[in-house]
Regions:
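Short beta-strand elements in bilobed, periplasmic/extracellular small-molecule ligand-binding domains
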Residues: 32-35, 165-175
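N-terminal beta1-alpha1-beta2 submodule of the flavodoxin-like/Rossmannoid cofactor-binding fold
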Residues: 1-86, 90-102, 106-107, 198-311
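Residue-level detector of family-conserved "landmark" positions at structurally sensitive sites
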Residues: 36, 94, 112, 171-172
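Helix-loop-strand module that forms the ligand-binding subsite of alpha/beta enzymes
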Residues: 62-159
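Catalytic cores of enzyme domains
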Residues: 129, 135-160, 165, 174-218, ...
Length: 311
C-alpha cells in the first residue's frame, strides 16, 4: 500500500506540514509514503490542443505534447494506491497550480476516454493507454485558508477526482488556519484524514466517503447552479439535475434516480458526454470546410494581432 502526499504550498509552510502530518498517520497504518511539492516542479498550462484525445482515439496510447514534469508526477500518482493533496486556498478556491494539474488530467486521464481507447487499441492492434489509469484509487483533499473565504475549494478539488473516477475519502476545508501547525484539534483532524485514506487504500472497492455530509446526496457538493425562477438546480460537481427543497429549515437536493446515470463522475455519464462531444466535433469539422467559416476566421485573424512583450 502506497500513499502519495502532494503539497501545493510553499516550502516548509502550512501545507507541507499538514501534508506530512497526514502521511505520518498513513505510515503508522503500515503504508509506504512519499511526498511531492508542486512548486518544485515545472508544470505547463494545458493549451487545449487535444493531441491527447487524438492519440487515445487512434490507438496510439496516451500522449501529451508538452515537455515538462507532469508525466513524472503522473507516474508517481498512478503508482500510488491513495493520494493526499494539501493546498492553500486562493480566491476562495484551489490554487492555480492545482487547477493546471486538473486541466492536464482532462480529457487525457478521463476514465471513459481511456476505456474506449483501450478497446480501440485491442481491436486495431494499436498501443493501449497505461493500464494503471483504469485502476481504482482513493484521494483526499485538504484546504488551508486564512479566513472564511473558502466556499469554492471543495468543488474545485473534487472535480480533479471526477476525471479519473477516483474515490474521494475526505474533502476538508480549514478556514482561519494560518496557525494550524499549533492548533491541536485541527492537527488531530489532519491526522485522522491520513489514517482514513490508509484504511481506504487497503480495500478500495469498499472504501466510502468519510467527510462531512454535503447537500448533494451523490457527491456531497454544496455548490449548485440555481434557476432563479424555480427550484431546479444543477450540482456544480457531479452535474446531476434536480430540485432544491427546504424542510424543517434544512436544505436538501433531490433528483430522479434515472438522472444518476448522467452524473459526470460515473462511467455511464462519461460515455454520454463522450458521445455528445463526438457529435459536436463532427458538426464543427463540417463547418470548418465552408467558405463562410474560413472567411470569418480570416477576418478575425487579420483584424488585430496579439501584443507580446519583447524578449
Amino acid at each position: 500500500m502506497k500513499i502519495l502526499g502532494i503539497s501545493g504550498g510553499r516550502k516548509d509552510g502550512n501545507n507541507d506540514a499538514m501534508c506530512k502530518e497526514a502521511l505520518m498517520a498513513a505510515k503508522e497504518m503500515g503504508a509506504e509514503v512519499e511526498f511531492v511539492r508542486l512548486l518544485d516542479l515545472d508544470i505547463k498550462y494545458c493549451t487545449g490542443c487535444t493531441a491527447c484525445v487524438g492519440s487515445l482515439m487512434t490507438g496510439k496510447g496516451n500522449m501529451c505534447v508538452l515537455k515538462d514534469d507532469f508525466d513524472w508526477l503522473l507516474d508517481k500518482m498512478l503508482d500510488a494506491d491513495g493520494i493526499i493533496f494539501a493546498n492553500p486556498i486562493f480566491c476562495k478556491g484551489a490554487p492555480s497550480l492545482f487547477l493546471t494539474i486538473r486541466d492536464r488530467f482532462g480529457p487525457r486521464m478521463d476514465r471513459g476516454n481511456n476505456v474506449v481507447a483501450t478497446k480501440i487499441a485491442e481491436a486495431t492492434g494499436g498501443k493501449a493507454p497505461d493500464p494503471r489509469i483504469l485502476k481504482d484509487k482513493v484521494v483526499s483533499y485538504i484546504g488551508i485558508g486564512g479566513s472564511d473565504w473558502v466556499t469554492r475549494f471543495q468543488c474545485d478539488s473534487a472535480i480533479q477526482a471526477l476525471t479519473p473516477m477516483w474515490k474521494v475519502i475526505n474533502n476538508e476545508v480549514f478556514p482561519w488556519s494560518t496557525g494550524i501547525v499549533v492548533d491541536k484539534d485541527k492537527v488531530a483532524k489532519i491526522h485522522e484524514i491520513g489514517a482514513n485514506i490508509a484504511t481506504a487504500a487497503q480495500d478500495i472497492a469498499n472504501a466510502t466517503y468519510k467527510g462531512e455530509e454535503g447537500v448533494c446526496p451523490h457527491c456531497h457538493s454544496r455548490n449548485f447552479y440555481l434557476d432563479r425562477e424555480s427550484t431546479h438546480a444543477v450540482c456544480c460537481m457531479c452535474g446531476i439535475e434536480g430540485d432544491v427543497k427546504i424542510l424543517d429549515g434544512k436544505v436538501s437536493f433531490e433528483f430522479p434516480e434515472e438522472h444518476l446515470e448522467h452524473a459526470h463522475d460515473t462511467l455511464s455519464g462519461k460515455l454520454i458526454h463522450a458521445d455528445d462531444i463526438k457529435k459536436t466535433v463532427a458538426i464543427s469539422m463540417e463547418l470548418k470546410k465552408s467558405d463562410d467559416y474560413k472567411q470569418r476566421l480570416e477576418n478575425y485573424k487579420n483584424f488585430i494581432t496579439a501584443t507580446k512583450p519583447q524578449r
